[in-house]
Amino acid sequence: MLGRSRLTFVLLSVTVTCSVAQHVPPWTEDCRKSTYPPSGPTYRGPVPWYTINLDLPPYKRWHELMVDKAPALKVIVNYLKNMINAFEPSGKIVQLVDQKLPGLLGSFPGPFEEEMKGIAAVTEIPLGEIILFNIFYEFFTICTSIITEDKEGHLLHARNMDFGVFLGWNVNNNTWVVTEELKPLTVNLDFQRNSKTVFKAAGFAGYVGMLTGFKPGLFSLTLNERFSTNGGFMGVIEWILGKKDAKWIGFIIRSVLENSTSYEEAKTILTKSKILAPAYFILGGSKSGEGCVITRDRVQSLDIYELDPKQGIWYVVQTNYDRWKNPFFLDNRRTPAKMCLNRTTQENISFATMYDVLSTKPVLNKLTVYTALIDVTKGQFETYLRDCPDPCIGW
């Protein structure tokens, strides 16, 4: 009971701090400049590359990666178990995870079932806990995604991956526990078939879905969570109870990256597929005007907001709120991102200036795990681990 009260106090303290601080210095700042190439206190380090060989049986595809990352995965899985046990000390919930979730594996699409079994075998983590690790990305992805088009019609796509809100606050160093534990698990992935790249992505070791990636020469895709009362928790409950006609958002993104052959095909799938959780799909292409934010509920598309440079719309910015609504007053990353893009101007957009925008507080915040920069046409994909030293807002 004491642990639960302490957690409540910490969350309230963080919320009050954010409500007071987000709109005033030093938690906000003027648009950053000259932060690229990454260096200094906001740069944690590079992200390693691994090849995922799609010609291998699904059970074996992740073995090399998971041999390296098993210790870090065990740390975060154990933390999640301890967090669950803090609310249910009997351990029955974790017991149910270990005993019941593997029985649901036959409901997962494509190769994901065998891939998760392979990860469990290599890491010696119970299969139910590997499934839980893959499920919880449906709920806590709070991000900023941007697509820009310069004066020559060249497209860039960038994102901050913010993850881990309310999953434990470390009062000793003012960080989110899960955010910090995800950084050693962050990897760049080159998915290959016949020794040729099919797509590239940034992900977390142990997670077989995708949240950030691109298909060279064709399109780029990122996912942002969309908050809704009829949200991911409801979708997961329905799925567990047997209603399995909706797709997991991380799995549909991977499927699109792996199988779609054009921007328009990807757009159609992301617009029309029934999904487990509401989401924003941020999709970029390789030609002028090929960039959009698809606002989704679980059943249908609510809005498609597209680049239109002839009408002066040379960028789209998506955080975690519908574009026709004001952001939550405790969490306005949209306004500073747009302000910094406008100050940058269309003539000066580049990897360097996009990184500057994503390095400006509160777009950069305590939840930021990594920043990704994507150039579909040139085939460039860069990912950098981030830090946000104090003073820095919690989200």
Swiss-Prot record:
Keywords: Disulfide bond, Glycoprotein, Hydrolase, Lipid metabolism, Lysosome, Secreted, Signal, Sphingolipid metabolism, Zymogen
PTM note: N-glycosylated. Proteolytically cleaved into two chains alpha and beta that remain associated via a disulfide bond. Cleavage gives rise to a conformation change that activates the enzyme. The same catalytic Cys residue mediates the autoproteolytic cleavage and subsequent hydrolysis of lipid substrates. The beta chain may undergo an additional C-terminal processing.
Site positions per UniProt: Important for catalytic activity: 162, 320, 333
Primary enzyme class: hydrolase
Catalytic residues, chain numbering: 143 (nucleophile)
Signal peptide segment: 1-21
Gene Ontology MF: a single term: N-acylsphingosine amidohydrolase activity
Reactions catalysed: an N-acylsphing-4-enine + H2O = sphing-4-enine + a fatty acid; N-dodecanoylsphing-4-enine + H2O = dodecanoate + sphing-4-enine; N-tetradecanoylsphing-4-enine + H2O = tetradecanoate + sphing-4-enine; N-hexadecanoylsphing-4-enine + H2O = sphing-4-enine + hexadecanoate
Known pathway: Lipid metabolism; sphingolipid metabolism
Keyword Disulfide bond: yes
Source organism, top-level taxon: Eukaryota
GO biological process: fatty acid metabolic process; sphingolipid metabolic process
Glycosylated residue positions: 173, 259, 342, 348
Localisation per UniProt entry: Lysosome; Secreted
InterPro entries found in the cross-reference section: Acid_ceramidase-like (IPR016699), Acid_ceramidase_N (IPR029130), CBAH/NAAA_C (IPR029132)
Function: Lysosomal ceramidase that hydrolyzes sphingolipid ceramides into sphingosine and free fatty acids at acidic pH. Ceramides, sphingosine, and its phosphorylated form sphingosine-1-phosphate are bioactive lipids that mediate cellular signaling pathways regulating several biological processes including cell proliferation, apoptosis and differentiation. Has a higher catalytic efficiency towards C12-ceramides versus other ceramides. Also catalyzes the reverse reaction allowing the synthesis of ceramides from fatty acids and sphingosine.
Subunit structure: Heterodimer; disulfide-linked. The heterodimer is composed of the disulfide-linked alpha and beta chains produced by autocatalytic cleavage of the precursor.
Similarity comment: Belongs to the acid ceramidase family.
Name of the protein in question: Acid ceramidase
Species this chain originates from: Balaenoptera acutorostrata scammoni (North Pacific minke whale)
